[in-house]
Amino acid sequence: MASGLDVLARLAAGAPIDAPTLVLVAHPDDETIGLGARLNRFTDLLLVTATNGAPLNMADAERAGFASATAYAQARKGEQARALDALAARPLEICFEVVDQACVDHVGDLADRLVDVLADRALVITHPYEGGHPDHDACAMAVQLACAQLGAEAPLRLEFAAYHQADGAMVSQAFWPDPSAPEVRPAMSTDDLARKTEAFAAYASQADVMSHFSPDREAYRLAPIYDFTRPPPPGACLFDGFGWALKSGDWRTRAAASAG
């Protein structure tokens, strides 16, 4: 298997990546925001989406014009398919069908399921632990736990940038700085940008969300080892300000209980 630095260099340059790879995202749209310019460079890609994209709270669904969580989830799945077509990406796909915003209570199960599908993968790429979204953090934890279970057989862990809080504001498509894990940014071609712009537009139900991101920005790095019993590296959690019942302190307690 190529070294982590070599993989990062290939991601930055847009070179083909032949190593069997698993990308774990929390929701339909995360793959496009975080890795959309590079998904078509993987020749052996398994895309795993942890949630169905539909919270039990109907606020998001109703705001997008849907009368049920089921209809909203189906619409988001269709949007993801259209986005992948726009990106010229042809991964194998699995959805674990966890309820959106509920991954914290399924960390252990997610890790166990990942062990089964990581056995033949050389690389795994997911969200960082940065307090941007509770499902993102749960994905980061599940991957770290799964790789710990696999030991010497574990794939190389990488991350794509999502969003976090710094100085009281949301910072998107950039990592919280970690000197031990410097980030790289891709050289995006005109075709890359055109495909990703079309993929952004495929997520019609998520137009408000997508407006916080730019198609021309991505960043990747080797994943550090996180201590999930402590607050994420930025300290403050962005999702504490979303008005949701789940707060970051509760997240750590429930994630630890779920992980066993």
PLM feature spans:
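Bulky hydrophobic/aromatic packing residues
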Residues: 18, 128, 140, 163-168, ...
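Short, flexible loop segments at boundaries between secondary-structure elements
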Residues: 151-177
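Active-site beta-strand->loop->alpha-helix modules in alpha/beta enzyme cores, enriched
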Residues: 1-159, 198, 202, 216-218, ...
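A conserved mid-domain beta-alpha-beta active-site/ligand-binding segment of alpha/beta enzyme cores
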Residues: 167-229
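C-terminal and late-domain segments of enzyme folds
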Residues: 207-260
